[in-house]
């Protein structure tokens, strides 16, 4: 079973829905016959299924947008043997299929042309990776805030960014823009592109210069699941005067995503001895306030001179019984 309620493309472009991705290619690549099945089970498979929940849909067109063209990929895996699958050929057929959808006035997603970005601190810079699931699409970009056109620089490899800028990019086929323009405001501060050490492999997101969106599964939020106390350390690589520490937190009440009850900052010049420099605490009422929103939580450090900043966050524990997701 697969869920069409999940995002079908880079989440920055998509209307609000459930968490996680299930792109056109994800569905096309899905293999219903699992590797650990006994050989005799494969012949008993009656078909494939995709579920479409509609709690985020307000009109029939919203449903159509989530169903089409992914329904074609579902049909493809139902009647095509795995060894005969060919993504490039499928896309050519998809172009014809989408023309039929247009002729019938059906609202469908063009998410296959949108760009997925990954920004990673590396060697003192931010390395920006741009991808599209369509191999026939070229990516053109600008760094001066202007809109990308077919004659803008062609993206060929990761871009190195070392300053605040607005990176814009879009996909083009035969000189025509096909996807939406991706706008990445890269912001630089004392922690940007600096190393982070902790227990979460995604902690590099904390210093990659990109703000997360209101979609908490957009691959720009660093999350800790079932872990009530976490800690990470930012190495600014030299002594710096720090007046304020600010961290962004997202609340998604319906998915039980909440800020911690305590954020504590400690500083060190040698990464061995740390001194407490400030903290913020939050009440249960503040933590479990309903809604879907982003907060910048600032803690004054009073101009302290430091190289290492250790951040410790402690959660409140389980959601209360009157929460939409208690426990």
Positions of predicted regions on the chain:
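Substrate-binding groove of N-acetylhexosamine-processing glycoside hydrolases
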Residues: 1-139, 187-199
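Solvent-exposed serine/threonine-rich low-complexity stretches and specific carbohydrate-binding patches
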Residues: 276-287
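Active-site lining segments that contact anionic ligands and/or coordinate catalytic metals
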Residues: 43-47, 125, 136, 156, ...
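Beta-sandwich strand segments
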Residues: 71, 177-179, 321-326
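Aromatic, loop-rich ligand-recognition surfaces of beta-strand-rich domains
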Residues: 214-278, 293-327
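Short, compositionally stereotyped local motifs that mark structural "simplifiers"
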Residues: 91-231, 250
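Short proline/glycine- and polar residue-rich coil/turn motifs
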Residues: 161, 285-291
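Hydrophobic, well-ordered secondary-structure elements that form the walls
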Residues: 71, 141, 169, 245, ...
